[in-house]
Structures are given as C-alpha cells and as structure tokens.
Design a protein with these regions (language model features):
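The serine-hydrolase catalytic nucleophile loop
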Residues: 34-47, 205
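Short beta-strand element of the alpha/beta-hydrolase
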Residues: 25-33
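Conserved alpha/beta-hydrolase
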Residues: 47-69
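The alpha/beta-hydrolase serine catalytic core
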Residues: 118-224, 228-270, 289-290
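Alpha/beta-hydrolase active-site loop
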Residues: 74-90
Length: 290
C-alpha cells in the first residue's frame, strides 16, 4: 500500500495531485471542500483507516487547490466536477463509496448521478449543494456585488484563510448550471449525512433539504447538535469513520453465499473497530477544509 504524492495529467496538460492507498473494494474516494486540500484532518483520518483495514482509498486536490496545477480563481463547479470524474475514471476500478465534505458533498452527488454504475454509497459531511446560489450569493454585500459586476471577482474574508479567497462571476454563473436541490435528486444508493447543528457555513436545514430531495429510501441524517462546520473533533472523526465503515459494508460486492457475505462484513467491522478514530487524528490539524 502506498500513499505517496502522484499526479494525474488532464487533457489540458494540467496536473491533479493525488494520493492512493491500494486495497480491497469498494474504494473510498474523498471529495474535499471549497478552497481546501487533501491534507485536511478528515481526509487523513480516512487514509489511516484504509491502511488499518486494508481498504482502497483515493484522495486528490481539485484544479487550483492544494498541490494541483491551476489558479483557484479560475475554478468553477464544472471544472471541479470534471476533475472528480477524471479521478474516478482513471484512478479507480470497481465499486465506490464517495465521501464528500461541504462543496465536496455537492460534487459527490454530481459524480454519483454521472456514474451510477460505479457509486454504491455516499457519506456526506455538511453537504453544500447549490451553495453558490443558495448560500453564497444571498450573503454578498452591495460592495461585493459591485466588485463582482465591475471586476469579475471579489476577495471574500475567511476564518480559514488569512488572505481570504476570490469569489468570481464565473463561479456564480457556472454554479447555477449544476443546481440539484430543486429535486428530485436521482441517487438510489445508501446515503449517510453528518451535519453540525452549530455549523455557521452550512445550515442544518440546507443539508436536510438535500436529504429529503434524494430519491434513495436508505438515507440516514445525523445531526450533531453542538457540531461546527469542520466536524473534526475526536468524537466527530469517530462518527465519520463509523459511517464510512458502514458505507463500505453496504457497498461491498454481493457474494452468492450469504453466510460468507455476513462473515466478511463482520470481519471488516471488527477490523475497523480495532483502530479508533481518535488515534487516526493528525497531531497537527493544519489548514482545515470546509
């Protein structure tokens, strides 16, 4: 198993940085948040979980994020969706569990819709579908709107980045192309949603709207009343690890022998429980993802 930094060259010769843990199917794919990267605590916890349990795991940085090529302000939902699909198509095989955080929850849904034959389960953390239209635009001040109209961009202050980050006209206009909350959202696989009740960035009602829009009948919405947007406390990481372990069991290939299938699931659950999430948490949380 390896987790060394590698690069996937896209059609425009720009590179996507990624790390992979080779292991058993289904493969877990991490989709990070807006202006985040694959070194965040939750992404690292899942890498440690994969190594501990022998499961396959892929994490990557979108265009303009982390160690990938490109300028962040040139990014759009269309581009990042294409990145996610390229990573899935070129770097994985077999059944998948997509784990999406914040914007990554939106992209996970878009990827599941585009690749229904591959995606077998979703775990969504503070999912922010349609955030450009539903969460970002309504909060723009008159000054910000004027700057975007005049200059095509505005620097948004952020508690996650001292320098803030650009919000562009292209991002807002392109985001509208990929709206899904009008529903129904054609995803039929099991979905587990983890949402903080004290999240200042994605209201729990927004995440619940997504859960209610999914066509899947196997949707579990977990509200962590005192949880924030990051959900990176030890107890939050334990919930995440448990949700991913459950999703992997639900997504594993069907065996003709039901006894063998039950034994395999039990063994995988035991293996997941032998490495508590509190031990997987990185000592230095570093720049946290949304």
């Amino acid at each position: 198993m390896t987790d060394s930094l590698q690069h996937l060259v896209r059609n425009d010769n720009l590179r996507l940085a990624y790390r992979v843990v080779h292991g058993t199917h289904p493969t877990v794919v991490w989709l990070g948040g807006f202006h985040s990267d694959m070194t965040g605590t939750k992404a690292q916890v899942l890498a440690d979980q994969a190594r501990a349990t022998g499961g396959g795991y892929l994490r990557f940085d979108y265009f303009g994020h982390g160690q990938s090529d490109g300028a962040f302000e040139d990014g759009t939902i269309s581009r990042w969706r294409e990145d996610a699909l390229a990573a899935i198509d070129e770097l994985t095989e077999g059944p998948l569990v997509l784990v999406g955080s914040s914007m990554g929850g939106w992209l996970a849904c878009l990827a599941a819709i585009a690749r229904p034959e591959r995606v077998e389960a979703l775990v969504l953390i503070a999912p922010a579908p349609d955030f450009t239209e539903k969460l970002m635009e309504p909060e723009l001040s008159d000054e910000a709107r004027a700057a975007i109209a005049r200059d095509g961009r505005w620097i948004r202050p952020s508690e996650y980045d001292d320098g803030g980050y650009p919000i562009t006209r292209a991002l807002l206009e392109d985001g509208a192309r990929w709206s899904i909350l009008a529903g129904p959202v054609p995803i039929e696989v099991p979905v587990r949603v983890l949402q903080g009740g004290a999240d200042p960035d994605v209201p729990w009602t927004h995440a619940l709207e997504l859960a209610n829009s999914l066509t899947s009948t196997d949707v579990v919405f977990t509200l962590i009343k005192d949880g924030d947007h990051r959900l990176s406390r030890p107890q939050d990481l334990e919930r995440l690890a448990a949700a991913v372990a459950e999703a992997r069991m639900l997504a594993e290939p069907v065996d003709d022998d039901p006894v063998a299938r039950r034994l395999a699931r039990a063994a995988r659950a035991r293996a997941a429980g032998q490495a508590p999430a509190t031990a997987w948490a990185a000592a230095d949380m570093g720049p946290e993802e949304e």
